[in-house]
Regions:
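C-terminal accessory domains/tails appended to large, multi-domain proteins
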Residues: 174-178
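Extreme N-terminal leader/activation tails
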Residues: 1-16, 21
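ADP-ribose/NAD+-binding catalytic cleft of ART/PARP-like enzymes
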Residues: 64-124
């Protein structure tokens, strides 16, 4: 979607929010909004179903009541097993990136990394993890079963356009499963 068309939709949406009869609720379903600057935009109540938000700038944007955004809580529940301690996730090491020297890759070890908090960034800094089947389908190396403890959930980021991966800032390594 080009910037002019997007600007027109947002202006009309603003009128709709103000109960102006000339306004129309923004329907951005399926729109390609990659790299769009939506900073400060009021998209409250907009339909964003299946809109591509990868790398879109949403700082200070109002997304309250927006439809179609991926719920992080629902995604975690649907794709990861729960235990009494937290969520079970899976990870590989050394395939794409060399692990930081301060990470001890051994059972019981807890690793930490600053996670990019931007949900519009599909693959960002942090400890990237995924469901077992996703990891197994992508990598032919050892797969670690890991735990994200309940108290560490504030450091978890589920990108709006995830291809299966999520990222976190703290993780406990449990065991190699493959």
């Amino acid at each position: 979607m080009n910037a002019k068309k997007l600007s027109e939709i947002i202006k009309s949406h603003k009128l709709w929010l103000g109960d102006n009869e000339d306004g129309i609720r923004a329907d951005l379903s399926g729109a390609d909004l990659r790299l769009a600057n939506l900073s400060g935009a009021n998209l409250s109540g907009a339909n964003l179903s299946e809109a591509s938000l990868s790398e879109a700038s949403l700082s200070r944007a109002d997304l309250s009541g927006a439809k179609g955004l991926l719920s992080a809580a629902n995604y975690l529940d649907a794709h990861f097993d729960r235990t009494t301690d937290g969520y079970i996730v899976y990870k590989t090491f050394g395939y794409l990136y060399i692990p930081p020297e301060n990470w001890k890759i051994e059972p019981g070890s807890i690793i930490e990394e600053t996670a990019n908090p931007d949900r519009c960034t599909e693959c960002g800094s942090g400890i990237n993890v995924a469901p077992f089947e996703w990891v197994k389908s992508k990598y032919n190396v050892d797969i670690w079963k890991c735990l994200i403890k309940w108290e560490w959930l504030p450091g978890v980021v589920v990108p709006y356009m995830t291809d299966g991966k999520i990222r976190c800032e703290k993780l406990q390594l449990l065991e190699v499963v493959k």
